[in-house]
Amino acid sequence: METDSEFFMGYAEITLKLPTDYSAGLLEKRIAEEIHGGNFTFHILRRSLDARNRRDIHFLARIGVTSDTLSGNPPEIRKLEIVRRRRDRRVVVTGCGPAGIFASLVLQKAGFSVTIIEKGAEAAKREEKISEFEKTGIFDFFGGYCFGEGGAGTFSDGKLTSRTKTISLEKDFVFDTLIKAGAPSEIAYETYPHVGSDKLKKIIPAIISEFRELGGKVIFESEVTEIFRNGGKISAVGISGAETGKIEGDYFIFANGHSSFKLYRLLISQGVFFTTKPFAIGFRVEHLQEEINFSMWRRRSLPGVKAAEYHLTADCSPGHAFTFCMCPGGRVVQSAPDGNSSVVNGMSNYARDGRFANSAVVTPFSLEEAAGGEISAGKALDVLEKMEHRFYNFRKSFDIPAARISDVIHGKKTADLPESSFSFKLIPADMSEFFPENVYERLKKGLQIFCRKLDCFENGVVMGFESKTSAPVKCLRNQNLTAAPFTNLYICGEGSGYSGGIVSSAADGIKTALSLMQGDF
């Protein structure tokens, strides 16, 4: 409710309990009742679904209200400041995922001349290539789920959650940019915001279009194959693919994601220091979404809520297991980084209205333990790559091993498998053959505990290899975020080992850009 009142407009924040199918009219009525009338405007600050009591599932909404009946002052709103000035500096960014896009956008806004080099294709072309891949099984180096415009996140659930507490300004900038590019405004206040792959495929190109309008350049379907150095600095990178040649620059940002093993090895060969870091591996589980809904809500659907989601953990002493990247109403996809590997991931659209739900079930994995002692970053990549190849070599194809959860926890052999969202074949298999014994035992125990927490969990299927929860290695970054031994090299995003997910990676890209700007004189 708008007002042109000349009286002082005060501010207050209120919390409302609302039915899941509340209307805009009901929301305004409840606000008016809470502040005892008067003219007011409002905005939703936070909204979460409270399903602790299945007989009384509702939204809890935190509302910021401005009204002539209130006396409080509104909170100070801080925004990320990007100062534009004339600069004679060229920045070459490798990778067009969240970190690369937002680092590039900020730097281009600040007056730098930025070129993005991306191994994969533009989003629309990438979608065509993926469709062809799923029909033929022929892997396209430039058109898979891992690489291309928007990174792996373009073909995901588009989750925008982040547990990082030190990125509030960067996070707000990311959300504002996404909303401006077409994301639903609700992402700014949902406790578990998500965009959906169908919307991301339009939003990301819109952001890239803004970047280009500012003068930025993007080279798709080309990969960095060589690094040229001049003393303690990188002077240029060599690229091959749709474009071939040498790209010179004053600063270089590698935002290549954690599936680019070739780039990791190139950087390591140039003396960039990486170390191993904790990460997790496991498989995907899939259920009928209706069964998940009923287990969580005791009803098949809930008006006003797209689909039920779960977040499960299990104490598997020693160690633990947990669900990761749950995709309600989604599907499982073959997210192989190359033609000899097999890795699964989950994705869903904005409506989350598919028949199936899927999630990773993973447990921490020690590369040192697998190697029998201390291990270099390069050797760590070899170990993980070998595991990804093992899943491909199972059938020398992108079909994947799978088993019913009930058979896994009872030690039985799976004879047949139910219908699945996966676009390739599921092959009944003994999943214990693909994992180190201690890893598999933790995963199995985790499944047993999850079956006690969700009564439909035993009805599901485990499938494939989930190995991309986070990077297996981490680069050494100086206080100014440069990567030793170079003074003009920055490594950010998931590939750096310092972030995970769309928002934290985008924020890391922004922080990298700001640090570069601060050091540029």
Language-model features: where?
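Residues forming the flavin
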Residues: 4-57, 63-155, 159-177, 181-521
